[in-house]
Structure formats: C-alpha cells, structure tokens
C-alpha cells in the first residue's frame, strides 16, 4: 500500500504471509484458509483459530503440537493476537478478553465479564504495549494497556467496527458498510 493503491495478491503470496514458510501444509489444517485466524509465532510455529473456536498449534514443519478449543462459557473466540509470550482472544458473546499462556494453553487472565467495558469485542490488534479492541456492540474502538490493564475509549464510529489495523501511518477499519482508511 506504499503508493496509496491496493494491489492484487497471488494465492501463494497470501498463504505465505498468513501461514509462514510451510504454508501449503499449514493451510490443509484449516477448514477455510481465508476465514481462519493465524499467528506466525517468533519461533516459526503457527497458531490457528477457526470460526467455531477450534484451535491448533503447529510446528514449523506443520506437525500438530496441540489442538483444542478457544471457548469461554460456550462462545467461540472471534479473534486472536500475540503479545510477548501470550495469546489474547476476544469473546463477543461474553464481552471478555482472555490471555492464554502459549506454553500450557491455559487461561491466565480475564478482562471483562458481567460489568464489562466491552460490547461484543471482535477484532484485536496489538500496537506497542496496547491491544486495540473492536467493539461491534458499541461501535467503539477500545484501547487496553497490557501493562496496567487500563481500558480507554480510543475512537467512536457511526456503525459497528469489526476489524482494525495500522500499517505505517495508515489506519484501516472494517465496518458494516466496508473497509475504510481512517
């Protein structure tokens, strides 16, 4: 996006970017490689999350190391993000963010719940020591400081926000009506 124009991307380049060097074998673990969420970890392992909450951790040669579910009170995780050595997941049905230990895949911390600052949290984007949380229920982008766990309203939209990302100086948001450069 350096020149301000979008460019078509070949399937293999998309898969390489999403799943890492062993993208062909890794993509075979996905029911739908387009909708599956993935994180290529610093050690080249890949964490996968399907829409139904099914999750897998694959070695760099696509060997299955762990499989299970990312669910909270019956609701599937909507998105995942990596911060340091932990995995964060959003659960829109419960208004919760959970932090998991990547070594044990055990829940370590919960933010939100009954009196939650979140309203249907979906997309997560880690930026420095903060995670940006897309609240589709309140149409707000929320910033969570990952050192103090303080929660701040960052930006308000006129319709639900589902995904947010920053690339260089450009910020993008996926709203109900489409993709926007903000």
List each language-model region with its residue ranges.
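WD40 beta-propeller blade core
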Residues: 14, 56, 98, 140-142, ...
């Amino acid at each position: 996006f350096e020149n301000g124009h979008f460019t078509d991307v070949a399937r293999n380049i998309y898969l390489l970017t999403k799943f890492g060097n062993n993208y062909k074998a890794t993509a075979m673990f996905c029911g739908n490689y387009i909708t599956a969420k993935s994180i290529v970890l610093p050690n080249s392992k890949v964490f996968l999350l399907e829409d139904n909450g099914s999750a897998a951790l694959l070695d760099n040669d696509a060997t299955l190391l762990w499989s299970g579910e990312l669910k909270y009170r019956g609701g599937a995780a909507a998105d995942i993000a990596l911060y340091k050595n932990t995995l964060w997941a959003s659960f829109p049905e419960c208004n919760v963010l959970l932090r998991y230990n990547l070594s044990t895949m055990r829940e370590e911390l919960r933010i939100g719940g009954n009196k939650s600052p979140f309203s249907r949290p979906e997309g997560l984007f880690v930026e420095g020591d903060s995670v940006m949380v897309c609240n589709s229920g309140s149409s707000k982008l929320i910033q969570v400081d990952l050192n103090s766990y303080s929660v701040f309203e960052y930006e308000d939209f006129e319709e639900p926000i589902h995904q947010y990302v920053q690339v260089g100086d450009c910020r993008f948001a996926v709203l109900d009506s489409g993709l926007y450069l903000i």
